[in-house]
Amino acid sequence: MAKGVNQIINNIRLRKLRKILNQINALSEEFSNFSDEALQAKTKEFKVYLNDNKASLNHILPQAYATVREASKRVLGMYPKDVQILGAIAMHQGNIAEMQTGEGKTLTATMPLYLNALTGKGAYLITTNDYLAKRDFLEMKPLYEWLGLSVSLGFVDIPEYEYAENEKYELYHHDIVYTTNGRLGFDYLIDNLADDIRAKFLPKLNFAIIDEVDSIILDAAQTPLVISGAPRVQSNLFHIVKTFVETLEKDKDFIVNFNKKEVWLTDEGSEKASHYFKVNSIYQQQYFDLVRMIHLSLRAKYLFKYNLDYFIFDGEIVLIDRITGRMLPGTKLQSGLHQAIEALENVEISQDMSVMATITFQNLFKQFDEFSGMTGTGKLGEKEFFDLYSKVVIEIPTHSPIERDDRPDRVFANGDKKNDAILKTVIGIHETQQPVLLITRTAEAAEYFSAELFKRDIPNNLLIAQNVAKEAQMIAEAGQLSAVTVATSMAGRGTDIKLSKEVHDIGGLAVIINEHMDNSRVDRQLRGRSGRQGDPGYSQIFVSLDDDLVKRWSNSNLAENKNLQTMDASKLESSALFKKRVKSIVNKAQRVSEETAMKNREMANEFEKSISVQRDKIYAERNHILEASDFDDFNFEQLARDVFTKDVKNLDLSSERALVNYIYENLSFVFDEDVSNINMQNDEEIIQFLIQQFTQQFNNRLEVAADSYLKLRFIQKSILKAIDSEWIEQVDNLQQLKASVNNRQNGQRNVIFEYHKVALETYEYMSEDIKRKMVRNLCLSILAFDKDGDMVIHFP
């Protein structure tokens, strides 16, 4: 019923898009008769029209799309099909376009990118990795340049590349920019740490199309981008605590909730810890760090799996994205968790760094005036797209009917029997020369199947996070005659698998999946590697009762039935009742997994709200300071009065010694005035005296700065230094606070309310501390000039 209603709604949306498509098609013959020069001149015509008439882009959409369509035929030899035009219209309108694998999303995106770039405000194509961004940029660059638009790759594809001055500015200030979500996110954070307007390089974020949008803003929504700062004081407890944790008994000394990714000590475990570390109670305030370390070690040991969440490369822990199967180089878990895993695996423990700046992908893309996206699996996430981003998913029909045969699951009582059946199936397919792609949940399983196939003289390519460098080549070869490719779920997205004619004739690509993934979108994405653009092919998932999905998310005890384990596998597999029960168990487990993941993303979004509001305020204030041409209207005396009024109220400045010490610490390193004539019982008199000292010291610094530009830079840097030092500390505190409340049992308190309450309190304290540091910086900084005559500021 619901499916039928959704289809009706989708058809209504498509009907509206088709009206615009008809307008574009009506222009096709006219535009095909244009000379190259006339077609190229359209770009300038559109820009002039938009500027002179203050018209919306919708007014010129039909002509603009007709222009790109015709230009694409002439420059690239590709003429966008009607279904691609529908997807392009949907994305310009800010929707998510669901387009199946092989339907030409790269070409589809050129139309809304071109249209939105005509405003002069820029447009971005954002994808998941460097390879795809560079590939799409190189393929589409000739089209944009032929039409008179500038286009760039938003990064230099050289490892450890150091950008020259203004190089990033030049990369980003093009009409169209191709980049990745990770690179844009880090650049956004770096740009907002600039202490000079000339060091900023990002333009205002106008319009973006996100490729594989569900992967980026749903699946990766909880992953914060973090810029690290100074190292924290390194704890020497990691190895000691690891040894203690190995003595604990699960369910007796500690409880693990795998689904919520929580772990906590029981009363017995707490007593055992107190005895082990020879303290009265580990919950005394002075042992807070010990308790934190115990929780970190438990999480590392029981919530993170080798070859699923991380692997070891060159003596370092490298994280893996569970959903995509891709490695996350340069990314570290925060708040000591990364170091706990390092201790667990006996590799060198790295420095735990403080957090300077952080943002989630959810909030990064909310910085754009508008964004849309495209994916092959959007409909299954439609509710979440709407709830989090107010985005509608429109299912775009395929150009050719999908010929892929998605076969029913094959079911087994246990993993050993299932694995034997998978190997027999792959060998059987290989004997027909039909190519096969075997996809596994973990790298460990992929390595197992690859090795077993080699033992049986079946050559195969192994694609896991550790050898991602060969990904494009392996995927390109996966559709060739007799090819066998074993891969993790990282094979589910990216480069298309193209079939040779011989392969097309013998049934296309066979996709074998060794178990259902945690969400049905990933299952569908993996199946979609076969059957692109009407190609033949088939997919099949193999299931057992001890699959990770079933063990983690199902409360069924069917797997414990001893009779099942001893029954003949072929008889069991042919049992309609058994298949029905297993299908029900798997479907329910996957549904619970999806609902839990959604709740976790909602929780992460709730946590992010406080820091998001605070970050927006801080960044807006920083930009206001950076863009100021003077500070004539800034009331420095009121700033000083606010600080001194609070300090006189909260600090004991009623003695001459206390007042003089306060001046030394906040206003002047050299002070020899007589304060005996000040009435120490009169707060206003003390405040007035402090304001006089502030004004004198501040003016002294301005005199050293000499000209108006240097005075401006001194004030800007003094204020920014105060903001940044306090904001960095606030961000780091909020990260640790979030980790702290996540370790507590949710049933005992409303952790979200608790987090926001503390976050607001600390923000208010931070705001006062910023003012105090501004006063200190304006009065105590030492200004000097280097041999080139450039001003150097030494802050207190």
Curated annotation (Swiss-Prot):
It is found in: Cell membrane; Cytoplasm. InterPro entries: Helicase_ATP-bd, Helicase_C-like, P-loop_NTPase, SecA, SecA2, SecA_DEAD, SecA_motor_DEAD, SecA_preprotein_X-link_dom. One of its GO terms (molecular function) is ATP binding. It is a peripheral membrane protein. Its EC number is 7.4.2.8. It is an enzyme of class 7 (translocase). One of its GO terms (cellular component) is cytosol. It catalyses: ATP + H2O + cellular proteinSide 1 = ADP + phosphate + cellular proteinSide 2. Belongs to the SecA family. This is Protein translocase subunit SecA 2. The lineage of its organism: Bacteria, Bacillati, Bacillota, Bacilli, Bacillales. The gene is secA2.
